Amino acid sequence: MLIPKKYYLLIILLSNCLLASCSINTPNPSNIALMQLTRENNYNLKWHSHKYLVKKINHYRTNGLFAYLSRNKITYANFNWQQISTNHYRLVLLNMIGNAKIDLHILPGLVKLIDFQGQSYLNEEALARIKILLGLDLPLNELHEWILGLPGQATNLTFNQQGYLHKISYHYHGQHWNITYKSYHEDKIPALPDCIEIRQDNNLIKLKMNEWSMS
């Protein structure tokens, strides 16, 4: 049976349209790679803009809830964290009735701890005391960076869609630390952490920042 010429031309036209449609819908690997690169560059731009604003912060204060969970111990406390001067940080852990459990000062070359009995410890003794109290060799020199949502010396990082830190992977004294930022205070400019989880092996520290204030 012969196909009329006008139908034959119509079939050819429809076939070409179908082929063109298929070629449009078929992912092009180079296009995918370009989209991924564009997305990564966008995240990097957001991150560097955010980091620049955070690094300009000084003389701040935050407070909230502290939880430490391990196989053998669970501790809950209120906490106050403060940047007193350029390189002077203070962490106070309080029990639920407001009495200080730990008063910790961190300065370049100096760590001072006052425990709940009023006993003072300096440097190596202070670090040893913290390890006894928490069961952790806590990287104090990184802590002030992590609290602000900065990576410190860590280079293994992931970001959320807003360009803020989402996860940090860090090695310290033979220990592997994972820091996860669960949420941020989006009402702040720049946005600052709202909930942080700091995990080392079976040890977990949770920080819930109720508020931030800048002086």
UniProtKB/Swiss-Prot annotation:
Its main location: membrane. A lipid is attached at residue 22 (S-diacylglycerol cysteine). Pfam families: LolB. The keyword Disulfide bond does not apply. Gene3D superfamilies: Lipoprotein localisation LolA/LolB/LppX. It is a lipid-anchor. Monomer. This is Outer-membrane lipoprotein LolB.
